[in-house]
């Protein structure tokens, strides 16, 4: 499977990470608990990239900072796809379903509440 296609759908990516896993015989390590733990660790690595930045600095990242964040978000996304495969659901469908729930709760006409950092 090609590894560099920006036109892949989320379903394509979900299939590609499954194939990547299978090619390495990693399925035995990919239970929901282990994948959730790995996902949490990757989120922690993302947080390390921005934890000590001011809100202003976080909005104007250096190219190096942006690249590090990009790598961590990719890791998070890969583990989320692996977790979806392990549990047995279509992540794209789950995202669509969640957006519908949030849209019902928060109509587009509502302004976002101000945050302390923005006030």
Model-inferred region functions:
Residues 1-119:
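Flexible "arm" and connector segments at domain edges
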């Amino acid at each position: 499977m090609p590894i560099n296609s920006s036109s892949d759908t989320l379903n394509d990516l979900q299939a590609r990470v499954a194939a990547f896993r299978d090619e390495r015989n990693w399925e035995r390590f990919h239970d929901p608990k282990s994948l959730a733990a790995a996902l949490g660790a990757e989120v922690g690595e993302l947080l390390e990239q921005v934890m000590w930045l001011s809100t202003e600095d976080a909005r104007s990242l250096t190219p190096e900072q942006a690249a590090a964040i990009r790598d961590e978000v990719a890791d998070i996304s890969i583990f989320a796809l692996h977790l979806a495969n392990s549990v047995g659901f279509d992540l794209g469908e789950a995202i669509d379903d969640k957006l519908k729930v949030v849209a019902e709760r928060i109509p587009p006409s509502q302004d976002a509440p101000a945050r302390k950092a923005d006030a």
